[in-house]
Amino acid sequence: MNINRPLYNYVNKEPLKLLLTLLTLWSFFAVTAGAEETAELSSPDNQPIVFVELFSTQACGFCPDADKLLSDIIQSGKAVGFGCHVDYFDVKEGSLSQPFCSKRQADYTRFLQSGPTYTPQMIINGLVDVMGHKTQQVLEAIDHVSNISTVSTIALQPLEDSDHYQVSLDAIDAEDDMPAAIWLAYIDQDHDITVADGANRGQDIIYKNIVSKVKELQAWDGGALTFTFSPMLEESHKGFLVFVQSQITGKILASSPLMQSEDSES
């Protein structure tokens, strides 16, 4: 199977495994359904996680289902990641779109050779793309990719009496993926929006896990590395996460859990 292509045909080949996957994730969602809207996303140190990106837009008729699915997956603790709203297909008012989201999606088209861009598109670990509103396909893709690709957890240590964090990365053997870049992603507070126009006009939608800014912290060659940085959060930010991505293959190599601002945690 070519992991650089959507898993549209793959999902039907292992129905028993898929059923078990769906039942497992259903239990995650059932447990978290009554939880607070802001979940604490954390993973034990050095345990692999799954990194999910959703390329979405308010103008897309299928996107609300994908946005909700992304929120459920992240809140369940099954994955970390964000929703990235593209600007080439968007509403005229109340837009959440960002030009860098369109660029990231175009970069994935090149990395994955996945054909024309579309929404909603979900990218798993930077390796596989799948239609973001197709729950069965998304869950099967997550299960499959988590078995073939390891995304290490980055532990961020807040420094005492400071707004800085320490990042420590162990050396890894990933020569084919180097060089890589270490990114800081700012995650917004939830957006409660009545969509003004387009396919979802008039719908009241709560958008969660929206990334509004990404910033490159520094390059990485795969060697052991420790450095500090200040996220400089604003009131509009729920929190942030740090992730490492190959500049050669687009593969996500490591990620922190969502680090929430004090206002979001209170």
Regions found by a protein language model. Give the residues of each.
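Bacterial N-terminal signal peptides that target proteins for export
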Residues: 3-20
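Bacterial N-terminal signal peptides
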Residues: 19-30
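Local sequence-structure signature of Cys/Sec-based thiol-disulfide redox active-site neighborhoods
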Residues: 43-84
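Solvent-exposed loop/turn segments at secondary-structure junctions
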Residues: 57-60, 86-91, 128-131
